[in-house]
Amino acid sequence: MFRGDFKGLVQKLDYIKGLGFSAIWITPVVLNRSDYDYHGYHGYDFYKVDPRLESAGASYQDLINAAHAKGMKIYQDVIHNHSSRWGAKGLFTPKTYGVRDAQWSWYYDERNDGFEYDGLTVEPKSGKSYYNGDLWSTAEPTGNTCVGWGTPTGHTSPEGYRIYNCQWPSPTSGMFPKALYHNCWIGNWEGEDSRSCWIHDDLADFNTENAQVQNYLIGAYNKYIDMGVDGFRLDTAVHIPRTTWNRRFLPAIQERVTQRFGAEAAANFFVFGEVAAFVNDKWNRGSVNHSAQFFTWKERKEYSADDEKAALEMYDYEQQQGTAAQPVSDNAFLRGNAYHTPDRSRFSGMNVIDMRMHMNFGDANNAFHNGKDSDDSYHDATYNVVYVDSHDYGPNKSSERYTGGTDAWAENMSLMWTFRGIPTLYYGSEIEFQKGKKIDCGPTCPLASTGRAYFGDHLAGEVTASDFGKVSSASGKVADTLAAPLARHLQRLNEIRRAVPALQMGQYSTEGISGSMAYKRRYTDAASGTDSFALVTVSGGATYTGIPNGTYTDAVTGDTKVVSGGTLTVPAPGKGNLRVYVLDLGGKNAAPGKIGTAGPYLK
């Protein structure tokens, strides 16, 4: 995340494919401006790929093309909520007060009118790639709106330096125009201001209800759609009103993909939002406007034509409606043993990260029961993006990478790969990389000591994937990484998931089933003639009643059971292990039998 480049990723696509993954979610690629970092969350030029990520023969376009050549997809993290503290090039960039006196000459670089910041090129006068000479002025700029320009604040820095008004970007100083940026700090994370104020001083909050801002962002992300990315992860989605997503940004994505690649491509362009509700419950402290599932739905009434007014009207209306009056759906659920065509008519166009499962992944059983408790409130929970930890947090908003142990990781994976939703893994978890390490500690410690450390050393060597989950050759350190117990577990889980359509796309039910983490899944598609029905239990035993009679074969062991009375009992396979009994329906829907070879957990 904070090191490496596209060339390294291109070179290791076979490692990712060899684990069995078919898609890669990468952090933002836009030109970042924030001293040393280039993670893209401090976007400065949204129309330019950060050159620190590119090299000869390894542009962003090269990465997209290379992934597609291997049958893999690229999901790009994108940000509509904010820019860097230095604004957004082409929209607005603030000018701060600066003075190259005895105290501050080290900080303020001399202006070089012939130099343009790109994050990579070293500016010759300062000797810095993070040159800031274009960002400050001692003379008050024309049209300045920052209050008290250049006057002493009466405060000093920790070093004892005099601090001046307008010396750094701030939402409340008047430095940012109200038309383009919000001018306040968030005071209540479950209040209206969480959608219309700054999160952090490094994240200048766009006025996303302004047409100029909307057009700037839509134009920028059209560029990456044109390059062929396969989907977007929407960062900080909760901090933008749902009306703005539903009116402007989500339709713009669909319109552009359709225009460039056709309606089928638009239907398959996967969009998922980060609605960061850090609670263990179904709704975020009772606030529907701040809950993940809320963003998967279209609006259910008309609001003012003006986007800013509409955002407030929608907020008030939905808060008054409360949690009990929100729409519900059975799109994720079987009707008895039958799959039914999902009703997509009320879908907003945004799927979401499953924050409730993420928060409750202290153990798999807890995540499972909390997850299914929320599923009727999503438009379609089978599209939820499910993970244990990420570049931001571990379960229960832990500041550390998951440290539950190898057996617990195996159990978590067995659940994620067979339950509804799209299983997602943060890099390195296949070897419990940096377990227990603090994910982020800002500039106070080396990145190598954090959960965001560089993983490339574990991938040194050569690897060739013959198919998803299949490695034909590996040498060097990467061979050791692939031999790790959880890496092998992942490979087989991915093999099984790919071979059983019900696990990939099916609806589920726990009706008539006894067992802690046990469920049945089915997917049917008349056009292709697909019908896939599977009984799943994770770690513990289960009894299934009221199921179709017939022959069932376990994809893990190859064991076959004939059901004649609608009941099947499965003994407990053990922690992290799994049973997937697939109904043999003959022909193209025949049970695949045992898939893969026994490993440390699936046996």
What are these regions (language model features)?
Residues T27, V49, D235, I240, ...:
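Conserved residues at the C-terminal ends of beta-strands
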Residues L13-D14, A526:
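Extracellular and analogous surface-interaction loops
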Residues S22, D230, P423:
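Short acidic/polar active-site loop segments enriched in Thr and Asp
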Residues P395-R401:
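Surface-exposed cleft-lining segments at the edges of enzyme active sites
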Residues W25, Q76, R233, L425-Y426:
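A generic structural-conservation signal
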Residues L63-G71, N81-H82, E123, G127, ...:
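Active-site-proximal helices and loops of the catalytic beta/alpha 8
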Residues M1-K12, G18-S22, P28-M227, R248-R260, ...:
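Substrate-binding/active-site clefts of carbohydrate-active enzymes
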Residues V388-P395:
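Active-site neighborhood of divalent metal-dependent phosphoester/pyrophosphate hydrolases
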